[in-house]
């Protein structure tokens, strides 16, 4: 007979509940949101499972009696190792990191473009003020002079 006990501090809150993934204490899989930079999927997010690192403050207690109960405990440990091997690690998913880097690069480029255009408008205003042609409403008043 095996007894599994998890510390209450090890559970992580899940923001969106789904019937596909059970409670985090039963399954050590968390979800990561990935935004795809395609025009057809704009605004949609994809959830992918990743493995959590084992925490030091979790407690595992296994007590087995002699005889058939010891075989049951071994079966539990084997099933846990199978679950861990089925989950793909983050290192083996280069596509996600590439998409994330590309999205960050695009955001930086957009921000830099906004700054450049704003600076260009300010320089243009400064030159027009120097010549006395700014603000444009002032030019209408000076037409008759």
UniProtKB/Swiss-Prot annotation:
GO terms for cellular component: chloroplast thylakoid membrane; ribonucleoprotein complex; ribosome. Transmembrane segments: none annotated. Residues 1-63 form a transit peptide. Residues 125-145 are annotated as: Disordered. GO terms for biological process: plastid translation. It is found in: Plastid, Chloroplast. Keywords: Chloroplast, Plastid, Ribonucleoprotein, Ribosomal protein, Transit peptide. Part of the 50S ribosomal subunit. PANTHER family: 50S RIBOSOMAL PROTEIN 5, CHLOROPLASTIC (PTHR34678), LARGE RIBOSOMAL SUBUNIT PROTEIN CL37 (PTHR34678:SF1). Belongs to the chloroplast-specific ribosomal protein cL37 family. This is Large ribosomal subunit protein cL37. It comes from Pisum sativum (Garden pea). The gene is PSRP5.
């Amino acid at each position: 007979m095996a007894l599994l006990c998890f510390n209450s501090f090890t559970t992580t809150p899940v923001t969106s509940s789904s019937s596909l993934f059970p409670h985090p204490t039963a399954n050590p899989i968390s979800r990561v949101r990935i935004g795809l930079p395609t025009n057809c999927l704009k605004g949609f997010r994809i959830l992918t499972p990743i493995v959590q690192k084992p925490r030091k403050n979790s407690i595992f207690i296994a007590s087995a009696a002699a005889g058939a109960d010891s075989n049951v405990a071994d079966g539990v440990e084997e099933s846990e190792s199978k679950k861990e091997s089925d989950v793909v690690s983050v290192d083996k998913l280069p596509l996600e990191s590439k998409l994330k880097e590309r999205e960050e690069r695009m955001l930086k480029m957009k921000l830099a473009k906004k700054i450049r255009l704003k600076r260009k408008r300010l320089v243009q205003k400064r030159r027009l003020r120097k010549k006395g042609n700014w603000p444009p409403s002032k030019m209408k008043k000076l037409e008759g002079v």
